[in-house]
């Protein structure tokens, strides 16, 4: 499906899927929250300064499907009985363009280290798979952080936008995701692409936790690139 994404086809490529077929393979983000809970959630996030609203017509759109790039949301019960909020961004992260100007790196860029002979990293791995952080991005990044579904303007009359039919929530923090979610999404995404015939199995990029930058004894230099199609924010 290279052509559908605007890339040049190669002579040895298998028959290409058209844009409609590719779009059918791309899952929609999940939205598992009731209307009443959704409103309470947005009121709370607005109160603590983690949400803003914009005109949904200005949203970036998927280059193949034309759907707006908005993350799904759902809740998950924790062992303590509390709930965690999950933002589901699976369908868009693989094709999201780098922002113009100064932008923050993707979550995968934060897990690559190369140490010299005398360098040491000391850390606790008790909860290492859930390295969690929230950063305050600039306005350019916020435009790519829509989540949930648009809401009626009368929900938040103080934030009403002239001419906008609805208000689209935007998340104001950049949140690192859980590597477990990335692994699952990567495996599922590969299976979908291979089963559909979009990519031959031997043409896939190897995936790993980061590049092996040094030469192993008796072997050539190996460079393994991360292939993240998910950064589910917790």
Where are these regions (language model features)?
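Nucleic-acid-interacting cores, centered on viral/eukaryotic replication and modification enzymes
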Residues: 1-234
């Amino acid at each position: 499906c290279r052509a559908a994404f605007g890339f040049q086809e190669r002579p040895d490529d298998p028959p290409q899927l058209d844009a409609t077929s590719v779009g059918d393979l791309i899952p929609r983000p999940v939205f598992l929250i009731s209307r009443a809970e959704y409103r309470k959630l947005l009121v709370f996030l607005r109160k603590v300064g983690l949400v803003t609203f914009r005109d949904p017509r200005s949203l970036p759109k998927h280059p193949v499907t034309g759907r707006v790039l908005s993350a799904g949301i759902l809740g998950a019960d924790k062992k303590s009985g509390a709930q965690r909020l999950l933002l589901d961004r699976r369908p868009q992260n693989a094709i999201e363009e780098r922002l113009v100007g100064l932008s923050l790196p993707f979550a995968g860029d934060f897990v690559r280290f190369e140490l010299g002979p005398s360098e040491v990293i000391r850390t606790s791995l008790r909860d290492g798979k859930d390295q969690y952080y929230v950063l305050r991005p600039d306005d350019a990044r916020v435009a790519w952080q829509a989540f949930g579904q648009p809401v009626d303007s009368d929900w938040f009359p103080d934030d009403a936008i002239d001419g906008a039919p609805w208000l689209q929530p935007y998340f104001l923090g950049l949140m690192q995701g859980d590597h477990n979610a990335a692994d699952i999404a990567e495996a599922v995404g590969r299976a979908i692409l291979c089963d559909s015939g979009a990519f031959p199995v031997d043409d896939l990029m190897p995936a790993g936790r980061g590049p092996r930058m040094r030469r192993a004894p008796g072997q050539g230099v190996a460079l393994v690139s991360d292939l993240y199609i998910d950064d589910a924010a917790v």
